[in-house]
Amino acid sequence: MNKNNNIEIFSIGGYSSWCYYKPFRALFDCGEGFATHFRNKIFGVDSLYLSHVHSDHLSGIPQFLNSRTSARGDKEKELTIYYPISVYGQEKIDAIKTLTKFNKHVKWVGILPDFKQDITNKHYITAFKTRHSKESLGYIIYEKRTRLKREYKNRNQHEIKRLVASGEKISEQYEFADFVYALDNCGFSEEINGCNWFIQDANFLNPDDKERNTHNTLSEAINKANEIDAKNTILTHVSSRYFNEPPKVKVPNGMVLLDKPIKFKF
């Protein structure tokens, strides 16, 4: 698995979840303790994308926003928070707004699964529906790439140069999923054909512990990672019931299981 310290993540099912993707200064969910872990690095966050409004995914927002008014850093830096639109969720969002009313540099944007936004001239982010709660979303950061058209792949370098010189259009644009965030979920139907990083719910290490269809078992999580052809998969949001005596499980190459209550870097 690649490790370049671009991802910092902490996730314990039912308690706290947050994931920071450094290349785009994007924070996904903001459970309890995020600001304490990040300290002055909280000013590096440009955007926060909430997957849903369960407390373990947003309870850290008041501390995060209020710390940006008191800690050492650019206190006037703008922050945009994207959240799934729902009647139930709006009550929680409004409560957080009240608790953080002294931070005047926050923009709240309600979104639906058709959300799409450019984040650089070569990247954009989209939201998709996940099976977990009524309003829950996952997120994908796509990279716009260029490749040789299929019909020219067997041509030698001399032929390629000749075709380019003649004005032939031999390349095409395509989109590649650089980063997929899917906490929490017990499945999703979004079509993904390969991705670099996949943040995946693996709440139940023992399939017999699964009581409701709101989270994945480890085997379900692995199967989904294989299905979407993920190059690097972080299996997380593990239930705390396993921390004292974790079962002995193995995961395939290219995957890592976060089965300890500590912050991880990748």
What spans do the regions from the language model cover?
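Conserved beta-strand hairpin/beta-sheet module of binuclear metal-dependent hydrolase folds
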Residues: 1-41, 47, 137-141, 147-148, ...
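Active-site metal-binding motif and surrounding structural segment of the metallo-beta-lactamase
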Residues: 33-82, 110
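Active-site neighborhood of divalent metal-dependent phosphoester bond hydrolases
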Residues: 74-79, 85-110, 241
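Active-site-proximal loop/helix segment associated with metal-binding centers of metalloenzymes
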Residues: 120-193, 197-202
